[in-house]
């Protein structure tokens, strides 16, 4: 596959991943009746009532992370082609991206397992609570730290090697800082999804874990598609 196709496909996959995220996000908003992890019976009932919703989000996550792997591989290739001296940073970016994808898949598997347990009579609320609490940092502080590293490394590599415009690098740095601002939420009190800043708060879990990365991927995805067009129009590609 030539550079033209790699850049176009990778950029398109990045944009497609965000499109699926936009479809997925409302599913989280319509879940009802979460009484907290300290109410075992209520937690099991919540999981049963929202089981289809949860499984749908897990399935959509599978699509998103698959598209993200293609996007990350293409961006790594772009970094290497633009400046071979930045290849190491491109590899670091891709490696951190794979770790992020792995963490997401583990968290998704735990979330799906809560539904499986809740639908298996008699359900074990203790197991459901354990798996639910195990997901908080995977979706929150841990994921945010990895996303920040990904965007910071990629932004430096693409600007240093002039693979992408400088403004995209500054956007990546800003998004990385936004993610890092929510990493310390892991130290703030008990998990409470109804509050903004805590290990399970809607700040780190819903806002910071999705929108900064989405903004950066949209910008880079569009630039990669345009990069592919310039490659196609260059004399070397003719």
Please annotate each region the language model reported.
Residues 1-238:
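Hydrophobic, aromatic-enriched alpha-helical segments typical of multi-pass transmembrane helices
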């Amino acid at each position: 596959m030539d550079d033209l196709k790699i850049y176009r496909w990778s950029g398109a996959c990045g944009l497609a991943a965000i499109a699926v995220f936009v479809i997925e996000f409302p599913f989280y908003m319509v879940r009802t009746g979460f009484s907290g992890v300290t109410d075992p019976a209520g937690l099991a009932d919540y999981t049963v009532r929202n089981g289809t919703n949860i499984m749908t989000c897990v399935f959509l996550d599978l699509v998103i992370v698959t598209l993200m792997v293609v996007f990350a591989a293409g961006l790594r290739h772009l970094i290497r082609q633009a400046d071979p001296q930045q290849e190491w940073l491109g590899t670091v970016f891709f490696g951190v991206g794979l770790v992020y994808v792995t963490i997401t898949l583990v968290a998704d598997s735990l979330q799906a397992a809560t539904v499986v347990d809740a639908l298996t009579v008699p359900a074990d609320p203790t197991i459901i609570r354990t798996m639910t609490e195990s997901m908080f940092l995977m979706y929150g502080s841990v994921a945010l730290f990895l996303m920040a590293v990904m965007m910071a490394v990629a932004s430096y590599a693409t600007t240093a090697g002039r693979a992408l415009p400088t403004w995209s690098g500054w956007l990546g740095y800003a998004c990385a800082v936004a993610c890092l601002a929510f990493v310390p939420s892991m130290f703030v009190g008990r998990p409470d999804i109804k509050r903004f800043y805590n290990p399970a708060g809607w700040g780190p879990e819903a806002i910071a874990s999705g929108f900064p990365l989405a903004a950066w991927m949209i910008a880079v995805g569009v630039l990669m598609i345009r990069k592919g067009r310039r490659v196609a129009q260059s004399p070397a590609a003719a």
